[in-house]
Amino acid sequence: TEGEYACIFYKKGNYEVLDQGNFWLSETPDVPGSKGWDAAIERIATWGKFRDKKTGKIFMAVNTHFDHVGIEARKQSALLIIDKIKEIVGKRPAVVTGDFNITDKNEAYKTMVTNKFVLKDAYKISPSHGGVAYSCNGFGKTSQNKRQKIDFIFVTPKIEVNRTVTPMDGESHII
């Protein structure tokens, strides 16, 4: 494929895909390549509706990449993702991951965690953390002590988080 994408990796032995798709973070989410609000470029969210093969429980996973410029685009993207979760799985558990291009002080972050549809920051509700406290490496231009967390995992209340790990640069073998 060409252009923006946000893939979801999963273990086929553990999960069955019941449905899947993507939507564009825009006023016209079903129009491929549509750019929304004040976004600099087209952005997307990919989703999957899964069944856990052991327990039979159904849940939704969403992976996304928010715009790096548009303030309104990020806030509206958060609302759109929440609406899509409600539409696709209702009150069933959901996990939202991605590069949100925001910190936890940003309005879009607050929209994710304070909306009537409750999402929680997995890092903040986890009793244990591993790795580093940032997720943006600064592309070699930012000292380690000034790097920020811009990638998040949000979960619905029915999901228990026991530990979060943000791997240090190059430690992708943790997952």
Model-derived regions, located:
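Hydrophobic/aromatic residues located in beta-strands of well-ordered beta-sheets
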Residues: A61, A94-V96
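A short, histidine- and acid-enriched strand-loop-helix "catalytic/donor-clamping" loop
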Residues: V69
